[in-house]
C-alpha cells in the first residue's frame, strides 16, 4: 500500500493519515467524453498494517492496504466501504473493512481511496481485480456528476512497484488552494499534477527532492508544433504524505506527457518503480 509510505520513524504516522446526496444519476461519460473509470488498484501491503492503524480504523492492524485511483474526483459523502468489491484469483469476493481518502484530500486530489481489509494473500490467492459495486459518485466539479458503479480494474501485484496513473494541468492562479504541501515558486507558467498508484519515496525513505525533479521528463509542445523534453523547474506538493506531485514548469509551452525512469522511488513494501509514462490531460476532475 504505497500511500502509507513514510520515513522509518514516521511510517506509522503516515499509515494513520490514510485511516482517518442526492439520488444517483447514472452516466458513462462526462461532457468531454471522459469515461468514469478506475485507473489503478495497488496491492501495497499484505497483512502488514501496524497496530496504530486501529486508532482511526478499529481492527485495521494486520490487514491489507490497497489504494485505488479513480478518473474523476469523487463526492466523499457517497463513499462507503460497500462501494468496493475485491475479487481474488480464486474468485472469492471481499468487501473492505473500511475506506478512507486520507491523506490525498487537497482540492483536485479527491480521487484516491485507500481500501483496508483482507483481500487475499500474495502467495496463494492474491487479489485479482477491484470492482465498484455501489453508487460512488463524482463530485461534478468540472463535469456532470457520474456514477462509478460497474467500473473495474486489475490489481497491481504486491511485488510490483508504483507507476504514474494520471497527469493533468492545473491553473497556476489556483495553486495555493490546490495543495497543503509545498508550493511551486513564484513565476512558474504552468503546473502539472501527477498522481502515482500510491505514495512514493526514495529507497532511503526520505521525501522526493531535487534529484527526483531532474528525473521527471516533461514533453512540451510549442505553438509551431515542435516538441521539447524538459525537467520541471521545481517539484512541489511534498511533505504531505499523499501520492501526488506538482511539476512546476517555467515555460508556456503546453505539457503533453510525463516520464519517470525505473528504479528511483519505492513503495512501503520496498518495491522500486518501473519506467513509467503518462499523457497529460486538461485538468478534468
What are the residue ranges of the model-derived segments?
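Bacterial N-terminal signal peptides
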Residues: 12-23
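Bacterial N-terminal signal peptides that target proteins for export
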Residues: 2-14
